[in-house]
């Protein structure tokens, strides 16, 4: 198995044929898998662009594999190094795990994320290992069970009699009784999710330790029904204070099962991908961390708020719904609208517009008008070409007393919550 690690937007060189070479044939296989992935677009161009002698990774991160090769794509995060050396890969992988944990409620501390990132495995194998260890730990306290209603025709009454069935279907079988009863069983939707995850991950894991753990878990779950992933009943999973320890595992299983897997009749996976568009991940991560920053302040965060439309037609029907990334409310009153952008903003000396897209400005003006919000913000990741993180520009919106603020946050350190809280206090007096 040929493996490569590359940063988003960087190039992956295609080698001449030889031992350990990433050849044109392997590149074509990867492109085919990319084209089949949900996030890949029609021809996989949202994951890789083909430049004949090299592939260029796009703005997605994670792992993609085809028969004979795999590629790990890591984000570019200023201050953590690059994917070209092991130290940089370790730092970036740890931060990516932390971002995924925050975005998908995986109940993982920053320290644990750093420790996981230090493992010399791809992000996929790290997450598989985490799933196996946590599932084993949880099983030490027993597999979750629940009473499930059953129906059976028995020689003696168990539970209550199904009168209708007894006097219709069993009318000429008096030796049998139509019973309806509840039975305590482990074959419930939650365990079926774990069974499906174990089977799927066993198809794609290449790390010997993970393969061993998955085989052991498969034996433990041998009596659980194998339900197709598309038929898993997520809505039927009930978690309360008696079984809350399974919440993080359920969310981790959901994360791992969202990948695109192409399997053969032999059970192995000739192609698979577990990929995250960085624009989406950055948006969810900032929303979750802002929720944490504003806890106890009387302010609330709504991600992907959908309550407003741009236009109303003559019949009174609303048209063209807007969906800002983040809206901060005090009660029912919006005090700030934030859109996140996973791109490098320019220094004002280099570019007076700082590389801010014109369409983004129009969009923020629309949000300001529709929400009646005096402050709107475009938020970017910080990089070394800027003086410091925080506010980088403030603009008066013509025709009203509203302002558009551009700002950055430093993702390389542990103080993001404090950065966000300080930035909101600085930008908008409504936060005080």
Predicted segments — roles?
Residues 1-35, 269-432:
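Catalytic core segments in nucleotide and nucleic-acid processing enzymes
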Residues 1-266, 271-272:
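Residue(s) in the substrate-gating loop at a strand-loop-helix junction
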């Amino acid at each position: 198995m040929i493996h490569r690690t590359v940063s988003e937007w960087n190039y992956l060189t295609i080698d001449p044929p030889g031992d350990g070479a990433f050849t044109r044939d392997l590149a074509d296989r990867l492109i085919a898998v990319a084209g089949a992935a949900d996030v890949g677009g029609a021809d996989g161009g949202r994951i890789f662009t083909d430049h004949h002698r090299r592939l260029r990774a796009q703005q997605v991160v994670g792992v993609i594999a085809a028969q004979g090769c795999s590629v790990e794509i890591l984000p570019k995060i200023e201050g953590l190094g690059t994917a070209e050396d092991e130290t940089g890969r370790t730092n970036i992988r740890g931060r990516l795990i932390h971002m995924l944990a925050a975005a998908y409620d995986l109940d993982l501390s920053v320290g644990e994320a750093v420790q996981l990132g230090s493992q010399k495995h791809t992000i996929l194998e790290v997450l598989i290992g985490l799933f196996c260890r946590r599932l084993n730990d949880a099983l030490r306290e027993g597999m979750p069970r629940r009473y499930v209603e059953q129906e059976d025709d028995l020689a003696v009454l168990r539970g209550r009699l199904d009168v209708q069935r007894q006097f219709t279907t069993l009318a000429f079988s008096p030796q049998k009784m139509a019973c309806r009863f509840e039975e305590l069983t482990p074959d419930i939707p939650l365990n079926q999710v774990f069974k499906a995850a174990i089977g799927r991950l066993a198809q794609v894991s290449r790390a010997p330790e993970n393969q061993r753990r998955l085989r052991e878990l498969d034996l433990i779950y041998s009596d659980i029904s194998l339900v197709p992933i598309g038929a898993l009943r997520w809505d039927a999973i009930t978690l309360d204070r008696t079984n809350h320890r399974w919440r993080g595992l359920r969310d981790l299983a959901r994360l791992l099962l969202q990948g695109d897997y192409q399997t053969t009749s032999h059970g192995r996976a000739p192609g698979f991908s577990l990929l995250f568009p960085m624009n989406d991940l950055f948006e969810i991560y900032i929303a979750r961390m802002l929720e944490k920053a504003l806890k106890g302040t009387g302010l609330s965060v709504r991600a992907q708020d959908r309550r407003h439309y741009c236009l109303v037609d003559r019949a009174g029907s609303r048209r063209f719904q807007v969906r800002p990334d983040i809206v901060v409310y005090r009660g029912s009153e919006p005090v700030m609208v934030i859109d996140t952008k996973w791109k490098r903003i320019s220094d004002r000396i280099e570019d007076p517009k700082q590389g801010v897209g014109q369409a983004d400005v129009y969009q923020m003006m629309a949000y300001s008008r529709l929400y009646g919000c005096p402050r709107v913000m475009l938020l970017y990741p910080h990089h070394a070409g800027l003086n410091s993180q925080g506010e980088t520009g403030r603009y008066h919106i013509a025709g009203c007393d509203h302002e558009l603020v551009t700002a950055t946050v430093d993702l390389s350190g542990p103080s993001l919550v404090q950065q966000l809280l300080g930035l909101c206090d600085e930008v908008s007096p409504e936060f005080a």
